[in-house]
């Protein structure tokens, strides 16, 4: 590792204050303005790598638009979902019997099912080593509830994730 290398970090709230070329940008904001911010950023600067918060966008059309933009600009994009890199998950993975199916459950009260379930799904997929799953939302309450954050919504109930090999993740979130 080179220790005598100097790097510059810019923290800005206006794109015109950014340099025209740089290696990495981290866009840390809520999902509603994210696509507009990415558009402004990439219209102003040439960027190699982009890190975005989950959930990325608020509609499927925004995902399509962003995908096209990132491809046009040649930007590699990562989603900030870091739990799988926490060392203790590697230790848990080492303890698992690879010949047995994983049946993982997590329970919670009054916390964001919509924005937090992804962390557990990501860990589940890391531990079971599979790349796809089916989701059963039949036990999610049909009532839409206002989130703690204005303008966002939340759901409660049970989600079930099933992989092709039969591994299962059960998420139960209640009020």
Regions found by a protein language model. Give the residues of each.
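Beta-loop-alpha module in the N-terminal Rossmann-like domain of NAD(P)-dependent dehydrogenases
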Residues: 7-51, 55-69
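A conserved mid-domain beta-alpha-beta active-site/ligand-binding segment of alpha/beta enzyme cores
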Residues: 154-157
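A short coil-to-beta-strand element that immediately follows conserved catalytic motifs
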Residues: 128-141
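NAD(P)-binding Rossmann-fold cofactor-contacting core
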Residues: 1-5
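A contiguous active-site-proximal alpha/beta segment in oxidoreductase catalytic domains
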Residues: 16, 24-27, 56-121
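Short loop/edge segments at beta-strand edges and connector loops
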Residues: 12-13, 52, 79-81, 137-139
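Active-site beta-strand termini and strand-to-loop segments that position acidic
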Residues: 159-166
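Conserved small/polar residues in nucleotide/adenosyl-binding loops
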Residues: 173-175
């Amino acid at each position: 590792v080179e220790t005598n290398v100097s790097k510059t970090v810019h923290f800005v709230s206006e794109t015109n204050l950014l340099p025209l070329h740089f290696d990495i940008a981290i866009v840390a904001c809520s999902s509603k303005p994210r696509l507009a911010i990415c558009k402004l950023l990439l219209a102003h600067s040439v960027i190699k790598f982009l890190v975005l918060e989950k959930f990325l966008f608020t509609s499927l059309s925004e995902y399509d638009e962003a995908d096209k933009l990132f491809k046009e600009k040649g930007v590699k994009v990562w989603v900030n979902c870091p739990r799988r890199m926490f060392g203790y998950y590697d230790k848990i993975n080492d303890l698992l019997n690879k010949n047995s199916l994983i049946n993982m459950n997590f329970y919670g009260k009054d916390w964001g099912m919509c924005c937090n379930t992804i962390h557990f799904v990501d860990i589940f997929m890391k531990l079971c080593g599979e790349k796809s799953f089916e989701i059963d939302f039949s036990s999610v309450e049909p009532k839409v509830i206002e989130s703690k954050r204005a303008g966002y919504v939340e759901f409660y109930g049970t989600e079930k994730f099933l992989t092709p090999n039969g591994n299962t993740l059960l998420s139960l979130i209640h009020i």
